[in-house]
């Protein structure tokens, strides 16, 4: 043990020591040691897939925590595994009972439903816990240098490797990170949480790894732990981390699939969808929203019947695009298609929007397009409307509002609206990095991904979302 525990951690370790003694009396090692088999899921091989260009993700099953208390009351491991299997490199399962409301039995329950390695996340202090983790079917364990000296760490890591399990070596400061390097840990986690007071500094991983940048072997993988709540944070830290361990920020959302996609891929929309295969392709690549255009003069206009087929192809959040159409028409389509939002591209007044809000289903958002001349130079003057959930900043010409395939001067977007706005207009795989740098909530792509109007190029879709990730 290290000589001075942080106060909160010290209490946890005291309780864990008691738990180990009680568990050993209840389930002696001799009763199951002969039944143990080596893991057949390679944690290290899985983590080698991660890179600073395309990070790996350790997604966590976490019911509660000391810092947040109960996080997910409806803790359905089957539901969680069903979502995580599509996105995770490794799945972490909390097994601490007192502080995280976890159980070792949770490991097998998740593992039997997925193909990824399972990480046993606990305060591991003894060989007994390592054996117990493998008995519970874990493929890797967490070892925390904040509670283990080098000799103890080496003993536990060696045993884990003998059982075919990998080790995620957790550090929380520069001294521990230096120890992890000296111990030749293959996967090093940097916990951005202060173990003294449970506060989070998301820049800790950057500060520590940059200090030791010239000492980190190229094959060593760095994982950022704790504090990831937005996709932009992942983008900001990718230059220092090969992967991210994420739990609390996902577990707090009812719609887990949406939460994972939003966090991993960002909140981006592909508009002008007309074909089933395009809906499936953009969802597979990471789109969160799909735009269906009902503006009659648009080259991408579709009928209700076409839309009904499209919305069954993938669980995108669908947005209907309208322009100066009746409230009755908009509400009819919103109800029939169970739209996530309606996007207004015309001259709809504040009173029209107020009435529309009263008539729409309560869970259907209203998005408002603000179209700026592609050659314009005057800053936008926008009177905010409490009934508008999101703004779309798009380009226009004298002939057309939106869907022009042209960009506008992005400096004209009011800075204070960027956190609730999406950027549209002439966005292509080539200018996505610059578009992302504008700081809007997400991007809205359409003609820049097309072969011709209404037909998406799957090659361009793949190229675009590679940039977006």
UniProtKB/Swiss-Prot annotation:
Stretch list, region N-(5'-phosphoribosyl)anthranilate isomerase: 268-469
Superkingdom as given in the UniProt entry: Bacteria
InterPro entries the record matches: Aldolase_TIM, Indole-3-glycerol_P_synth, Indole-3-glycerol_P_synth_dom, Indole-3-GlycerolPSynthase_CS, PRAI_dom, RibuloseP-bd_barrel
Transmembrane feature ranges: none
Keywords: Amino-acid biosynthesis, Aromatic amino acid biosynthesis, Decarboxylase, Isomerase, Lyase, Multifunctional enzyme, Tryptophan biosynthesis
Catalytic reactions of this protein: N-(5-phospho-beta-D-ribosyl)anthranilate = 1-(2-carboxyphenylamino)-1-deoxy-D-ribulose 5-phosphate; 1-(2-carboxyphenylamino)-1-deoxy-D-ribulose 5-phosphate + H(+) = (1S,2R)-1-C-(indol-3-yl)glycerol 3-phosphate + CO2 + H2O
One Gene Ontology term of the molecular function aspect: indole-3-glycerol-phosphate synthase activity
EC number: 4.1.1.48, 5.3.1.24
GO biological process: L-tryptophan biosynthetic process
CDD domains found in the cross-reference section: IGPS (cd00331), PRAI (cd00405)
Pathway named in the protein's UniProt entry: Amino-acid biosynthesis; L-tryptophan biosynthesis; L-tryptophan from chorismate: step 3/5; Amino-acid biosynthesis; L-tryptophan biosynthesis; L-tryptophan from chorismate: step 4/5
Signal peptide start and end residues: none
Pfam families attached to this UniProt entry: IGPS (PF00218), PRAI (PF00697)
Indole-3-glycerol phosphate synthase: region residues: 1-267
Isomerase recorded as keyword: yes
Function text: Bifunctional enzyme that catalyzes two sequential steps of tryptophan biosynthetic pathway. The first reaction is catalyzed by the isomerase, coded by the TrpF domain; the second reaction is catalyzed by the synthase, coded by the TrpC domain.
Assigned protein family: In the N-terminal section; belongs to the TrpC family. In the C-terminal section; belongs to the TrpF family.
Subunit structure: Monomer.
Protein name: Tryptophan biosynthesis protein TrpCF
Gene: trpC
């Amino acid at each position: 043990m290290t000589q001075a525990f942080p106060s909160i951690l010290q209490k946890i370790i005291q309780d864990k020591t008691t738990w180990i003694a009680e568990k050993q009396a209840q389930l002696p090692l001799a009763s199951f040691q002969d039944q143990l088999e080596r893991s057949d899921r390679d944690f290290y091989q899985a983590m080698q897939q991660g890179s600073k260009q395309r990070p790996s993700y350790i997604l966590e099953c976490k019911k509660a925590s000391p810092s947040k208390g109960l996080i997910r009351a409806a803790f359905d491991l089957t539901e969680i595994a069903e979502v995580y299997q599509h996105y995770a490199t490794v799945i972490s399962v909390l097994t601490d009972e007192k502080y995280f409301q976890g159980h070792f039995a949770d490991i097998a329950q998740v593992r039997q439903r997925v193909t990824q390695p399972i990480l046993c996340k606990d305060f591991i202090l003894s060989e007994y816990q390592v054996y117990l983790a493998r008995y519970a079917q874990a493929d890797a364990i967490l070892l925390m240098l904040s509670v283990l000296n080098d000799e103890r760490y080496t003993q536990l890591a060696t045993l884990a490797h003998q059982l075919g399990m990998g080790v995620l070596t957790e550090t929380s400061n520069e001294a521990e990170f230096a120890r992890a390097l000296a111990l030749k840990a293959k996967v090093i986690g940097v916990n951005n949480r202060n173990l003294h007071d449970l506060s989070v500094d998301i820049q800790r991983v950057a500060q520590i790894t940059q200090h030791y940048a010239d000492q980190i072997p190229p094959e060593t993988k760095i994982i950022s732990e704790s504090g990831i709540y937005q996709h932009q944070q992942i983008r900001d830290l990718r230059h220092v981390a090969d992967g991210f361990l994420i739990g609390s920020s996902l577990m707090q959302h009812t719609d887990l699939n949406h939460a994972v996609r939003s966090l991993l891929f960002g909140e981006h929309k592909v508009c002008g969808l007309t074909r089933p295969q395009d809906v499936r392709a953009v969802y597979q690549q990471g789109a969160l929203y799909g735009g269906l255009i009902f503006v009659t003069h648009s080259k991408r206009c579709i009928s209700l019947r076409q839309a009904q087929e499209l919305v069954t192809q993938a669980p995108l959040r669908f947005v209907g695009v309208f322009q100066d159409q009746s409230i009755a028409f908009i509400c009819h389509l919103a109800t029939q298609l169970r739209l996530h939002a309606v996007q207004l591209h015309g001259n709809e007044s504040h009173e029209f929007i107020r009435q529309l809000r009263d008539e729409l289903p309560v869970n259907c958002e209203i998005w408002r397009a603000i179209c700026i001349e592609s050659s314009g130079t005057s800053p936008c003057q926008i009177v905010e409307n409490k009934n508008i959930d999101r703004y779309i900043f798009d380009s226009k010409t004298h002939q057309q509002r939106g869907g022009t395939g042209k960009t506008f001067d992005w400096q004209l977007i009011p800075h204070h609206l960027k956190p609730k706005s999406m950027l549209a207009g002439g966005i292509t795989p080539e200018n996505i990095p610059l578009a992302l740098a504008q700081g809007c909530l997400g991007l809205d792509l359409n003609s820049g991904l097309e072969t011709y109007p209404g037909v998406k190029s799957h090659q361009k879709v793949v190229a675009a979302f590679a940039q977006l990730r």
